[in-house]
């Protein structure tokens, strides 16, 4: 591989890292005031507090400790796959939380959001680098996408 090709490859790799890092760091600063006020927890509103955090916490323990697919703690008893696949089972971010102890799950929401924003920026950069005039334009576009009002507003819908 020529020296010029290596430099171009390193520059592209730096674009991936830069997009991920800037978006994840921006998410940290977006959520930092909430972390300080709520002592490590991220309390939002509505379904996030009453569904998302309890679902994550419950299914974290269920996946680790349950023998079978039937959940007696959900309604009058139901299949966990049928009840939670929309919210959790299809999300790679949920599966990352299963690496943590169940008690830590509510405190892992902000790191998961940081990871999600970083991955959104990484994905946008991957797409935009093919169509932009240069790496910097692709990084700016990735940050604009990952930190857009659409993405920030939809933190409420944690399962997407």
List the model feature ranges, each with a label.
Residues 10-17, 103-106, 110-113, 132-135:
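Membrane-water interface of alpha-helical transmembrane segments
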Residues 125-147:
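Transmembrane-helix signature of polytopic, membrane-embedded enzymes
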Residues 13, 76-77, 137-139:
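Short hydrophobic "helix-edge" motifs at membrane interfaces and signal-peptide entry regions
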Residues 1-35:
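Start-transfer (signal-anchor) and selected internal transmembrane alpha helices
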Residues 19, 116, 121-124, 130-131:
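Functionally constrained cores in energy, signaling, and assembly domains
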Residues 17-21, 111, 139-143:
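Hydrophobic alpha-helical transmembrane segments
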Residues 26-121, 143-160:
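Membrane-interface coil-to-helix junctions
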